[in-house]
Amino acid sequence: MIKTVVSTYGEFIGEVDEGADVVVIKKPKMVIQSEKGFGFAKGVCVTSVSEPEEVTIQKANVVMVVDTNPEVLKAYEE
């Protein structure tokens, strides 16, 4: 299921699989904001490949996992 994950590093959208100690996000997109609204970064950090298959975040660094706004989900899927 596609979810929004807010971590201590940033906000991500993707298919979430929660493990005991980690959250794995498949097909992750990092959410960025500008004066014109929100968008998606080309990678998940400055030096990552442009579209990683997945990222793993330690649960200690996850602030929350929530359902994604339908409009944002539509933009993610495009």
Feature annotation, model-predicted:
Residues 1-78:
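Conserved RNA-binding domains used in RNP assembly and mRNA/RNA metabolism
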